[in-house]
Amino acid sequence: MNAHSPAAKTAIVIGAGFGGLALAIRLQSAGIATTLVEARDKPGGRAYVWHDQGHLFDAGPTVITDPDALKELWALTGQDMARDVTLMPVSPFYRLMWPGGKVFDYVNEADQLERQIAQFNPDDLEGYRRFRDYAEEVYQEGYVKLGTVPFLKLGQMLKAAPALMKLEAYKSVHAKVATFIKDPYLRQAFSYHTLLVGGNPFSTSSIYALIHALERRGGVWFAKGGTNQLVAGMVALFERLGGQMLLNAKVARIDTDGPRATGVTLADGRALTADMVASNGDVMHNYRDLLGHTARGQSRAKSLNAKRWSMSLFVLHFGLREAPKDVAHHTILFGPRYKELVNEIFKGPKLAEDFSLYLHSPCTTDPEMAPPGMSTHYVLAPVPHLGRADIDWAVEGPRYADRILASLEERLIPNLRANLTTTRIFTPSDFASELNAHHGSAFSVEPILTQSAWFRPHNRDKTIRNFYLVGAGTHPGAGIPGVVGSAKATAQVMLSDLASA
């Protein structure tokens, strides 16, 4: 066997979130003996899962788009994702609700969508169609052409720049939407998506309008049994391919020898060696903590600290004795303010008095997520990260949860608090302590234009040449399609490096 063939090589991937799992599958599929090391007792990263009183709670991502990107992981070795995962369509994609009673069902059926747009403002129909065409353009340019390109060289960014400038990528999503649509509610409806990947609609590049086209093309889906079942399916595929996963295996450091990574040392003292090391962990954690013993780690951590980080989330999981009627799978409950609230979420310096909420009600699509007749939910509020607002979440968390439950009861689910079976909160402090998230950020580095593509942490380190990044902190960014795309980009680099070694 050729000493430089992929089959002769080994890799360690740190972190069994979606990005780490997707990368490990790609490497193992290419014949690289891959070990996936996960600090927690279950795989999934942010997509953790737990059971409580018969309720099945997904901890993290709940919106599955671009199913073809997931199916590709199975197709690499001639397998079918349906063997391990059942995807269920979600309709409407989202239900948007405002104080005062306005409701907009974000659906994929063009006639239904346009009929609702006309009810808000008939004059915006033509503008919406032009926005739809624009979203398709940026989808082709930003997602299809560039979404899995590893931007390792400035020349790659310069090559992409003319098309991005033509598409006015320097404008924010909201500003671009506003050039097509005049109604303020509809402007919110077609710009809020960036919040789902950690971006401020008023500063995130208009390239992210591609999400509208991505959802129209591929739909919005839910994994039967919960997002955790997508994780379980990916683990099953990885292990069938011969990959090894270690749980309760916290990495204490990435070992190096000069400009090369040689493996990892676990917190229990075990040392693992490999030809290549990749990390799906928080990008600051990688450099500050795991590589903090190196000059590269120290210098990179300093530069990362100067970057803008995405907001955090306050997450409240709860079960109900009853299944509420007429509640959509995904509901966005806007507050009385939009731009002002979003700016306070991203800039601090304190927790706002009002909030906008995202409610996940999976039993609408899959009743088996709760005991018969009951329902499982989680609600989240975007909040400032720990570097923007000095909030004692041990004190504020329970109070904030009470305010959120009261709001849900008033606006959407009557008698909610009387029907509670269980609750659990996850705060920015938990993001920091349990997920090593810098500042408790829920989505890593904020996806503004000057922190995207080549400007984002690269998929391969420039100094430690066999150390690679995958996940939300590298190109293209957060969200399931983003981190799965980052795995494809990173795998390309790793396999290319092996081939040229």
From Swiss-Prot:
Its EC number is 1.3.99.31. FAD binds at residues 12-45. Keywords: Carotenoid biosynthesis, FAD, Flavoprotein, Oxidoreductase. Its cofactor is FAD. It holds the Pfam family Amino_oxidase. It comes from the Bacteria. GO terms for biological process: carotenoid biosynthetic process. Pathway: Carotenoid biosynthesis; astaxanthin biosynthesis. Transmembrane segments: none annotated. One of its GO terms (molecular function) is oxidoreductase activity, acting on the CH-CH group of donors. It catalyses: 15-cis-phytoene + 4 A = all-trans-lycopene + 4 AH2. This enzyme converts phytoene into lycopene via the intermediaries of phytofluene, zeta-carotene and neurosporene by the introduction of four double bonds. PANTHER family: B-CAROTENE KETOLASE (PTHR43734:SF3), PHYTOENE DESATURASE (PTHR43734). Belongs to the carotenoid/retinoid oxidoreductase family. This is Phytoene desaturase (lycopene-forming). The gene is crtI.
